[in-house]
């Protein structure tokens, strides 16, 4: 298959994204918004948004697609999936459901970062949330994405398929 690399024109987003404290934050928001726009314009079925600071284990994509097919068909509903089992999701004693995927179990979560797989249908349905995520630096950054999970199912694997290599010491991953 052909792979298209889409250049990022920051000027396209100058009047859309609120002025930020630094260029890096603006660039991150612009890049994310362009990714969401490409998914909305060109996505057909499943859409996978992947940040550049993750290490993915070899079975990740196969396991996610097979588990998506199994779980979404069992519950007759489109879902969101994260490839990482984030440490920060264990900070609160929140109830979760365990689902059987292809070769591992998955648990329901109510927060994610910006690396996730979903459907074009859910991207369209919650476009305002995706768009709002990119207009300013929110606290948490994924505030509007996390609002979606009040109505939709988001899951992460029990035994992570990816490792988030963040540049800070935090519960979001390893530094």
Residue ranges: model-predicted function:
Residues 2-7, 80, 154-156:
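Conserved beta-strand scaffold positions in the cores of enzyme catalytic domains, especially
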Residues 46, 55-129:
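Conserved catalytic core of nucleotide-sugar-dependent glycosyltransferases
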Residues 10-14, 25, 53-55, 86-89, ...:
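Short, solvent-exposed loop/turn segments at secondary-structure junctions
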Residues 1-44:
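Active-site-proximal specificity loops/subdomain of glycosyltransferases
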Residues 17-23, 95-101, 170-174:
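Short, surface-exposed amphipathic charged segments that create phosphate/polyanion-binding patches used
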Residues 25-33, 110-114, 120, 135-146:
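Conserved glycosyltransferase catalytic-site signature
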Residues 120-121, 125-175:
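C-terminal catalytic/acceptor-binding lobe
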């Amino acid at each position: 298959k052909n792979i298209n690399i889409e250049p990022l024109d920051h000027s396209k987003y100058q009047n859309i994204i609120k002025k930020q404290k630094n260029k890096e934050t603006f660039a991150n928001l612009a890049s994310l918004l362009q990714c969401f726009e490409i998914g909305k314009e060109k996505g057909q079925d499943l859409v996978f948004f992947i940040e550049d600071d993750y290490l993915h284990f070899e079975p990740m994509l196969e396991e996610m697609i097979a588990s998506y097919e199994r779980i979404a068909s069992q519950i007759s509903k489109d879902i969101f999936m994260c490839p990482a089992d984030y440490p920060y999701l264990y900070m609160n004693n929140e109830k979760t459901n365990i689902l059987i995927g292809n070769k591992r179990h998955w648990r329901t979560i109510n927060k994610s970062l910006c690396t996730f797989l979903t459907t074009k249908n859910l991207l369209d349905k919650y476009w305002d949330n995706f768009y709002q995520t990119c207009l300013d630096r929110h606290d948490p950054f994924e505030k509007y994405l996390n609002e979606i999970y009040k109505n939709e199912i988001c899951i992460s694997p029990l035994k992570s398929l990816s490792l988030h290599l963040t540049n800070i010491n935090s519960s979001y991953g390893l530094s």
